[in-house]
Amino acid sequence: MAKKASRAKKQVEEESGVEFVTDVPSWFRRERGRILNKGNLPESGECVVYWMIRDVRSVDNWALLYARHLAAKYNQPLMVLYVLPPPPSTTETVDEDVPPLQTSQKMTLRHGDFLLGGLQCVHKELNSLNIPMHVLQPDNVEVAQMVQDFITNQKASTCVVDYSPLRHVVGWLEQLTSVKIPVIQVDAHNIVPVWHASSKREVGARTLRPKLHKLLPDFLTDFPTLSPNTNKSSTPNINWGECHSYLQMDTSVPSINEICPPGNEAAMNQFTSFLSKGLSKFDELRNDPNYRHVCSNMSPYINHGQVSFQRLAWEVKHLRKHPLGTAAFLEEGIVRRELSDNYVHYTPNDYDTLQGAAQWAQDSLELHSTDEREYLYTTRQLQRGETHDDLWNASQHQLVQEGTLHGFVRTHQIQKNTFWNIFYRILLQHFFLM
């Protein structure tokens, strides 16, 4: 029986092209981690480094937990590294008709303040566990090179990194494989690791859903508690004011941290409120923008990695109340959310272009590209909510002022914006900007 199970596991790895980690504790599914670089024997180093990229939290973080496991095994301290995203080298002003490219857009104050606020929470929490956290600012140095230098200077034995499917992160990790130590990537964002859920890009939710549901009993588990460093470690001081200045943020989009405070504790407070006020009606009223209190409002925390959706799914499932609301919440948070990672993971070159869309969608856009438009609006008009559509304008104003938008209204915005634009390439830039 054991040999049969071993052969089955080997077959899964061969089909997916992924080499899973082998040295795992009982609470860790080996499929969560994949080996990017084997390197030398890790026992010869002086620490284990966890490079935090996407999952900015100290709790319910499989990548951090696995890194701590390795540190304990090798009797070495754990260090956490975060590299601030470099500001664009060149910036473009917003043209009346053509929005700037993504690569030249500054981080907004809204995103930057939320990011830094979350990092400060993580730094404080790790400090209480005697786990040092370093926040680096790349200056005329490639991010991957800075991480490689950090690993070398700290004499790291192993580098653990969390998972992101985005192109620039994939590029960093490809450069990092030149180091002579093991580099292990752990998917701490998806409940079922993206490379294990499916070996191909799925058509849609209907094809991914059965695959996820088959695997969920093994992967939707509780988390162990992160143990403190037992080895003495010096905790570096972080100048958060310097970090703020380094990001060179676009201050035209104000912070909303007072409305939506960052950090895992704030996220769980919001989730507790949703369980008591929204879950019972979530199935029935979640698509009605008149009932905003029914929505969870967890998207900022999930998207910024400040809370694990696996924690939310575990808690709502074990609440054992409101089965219809629970089913709808899990469908959106597991199937629909993990479908997006599947799309980006298996469409690495085109996920942010029209070429990444399904062929029928491309054909439809091409067919209607010459249709007469009753209304056409510039980038400025759309940003300011100056259209003939009162609902569209109101939703844009809400997005600017509150940083949130109901899912049904978001769909309305996208549909109308498609009607009001001739050039679909520019249309995508509109969406990225707004």
Question: In which residue ranges do the predicted regions lie?
Answer:
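Acidic/polar loop patches that form or flank catalytic/metal-binding clefts of enzymes
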Residues: D341-N342, G407, R425
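Aromatic-anchored, charged helix-turn/loop surface patch used as a conserved interaction hotspot
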Residues: E331, R336, S340-S395
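Trp/Phe/Arg-rich N-terminal binding region typifying the photolyase-homology
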Residues: M1-T230, G325, H397, K416-N421, ...
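Glycine/tryptophan-enriched, flexible segments
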Residues: A2-A5, V12-E15, W27-F28, E43-G45, ...
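Extended, compositionally biased non-globular segments
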Residues: T379-I422
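Short, hydrophobic/aromatic alpha-helical segments in well-folded domains
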Residues: Y66, M146, Q270, N297, ...
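Short, conserved micro-motifs enriched in small and acidic residues
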Residues: R57-N61, S299-N303, G403-F408
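Active/binding-pocket-proximal capping segment
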Residues: N349-D350, G356-D363, L367-S369, R410-M434
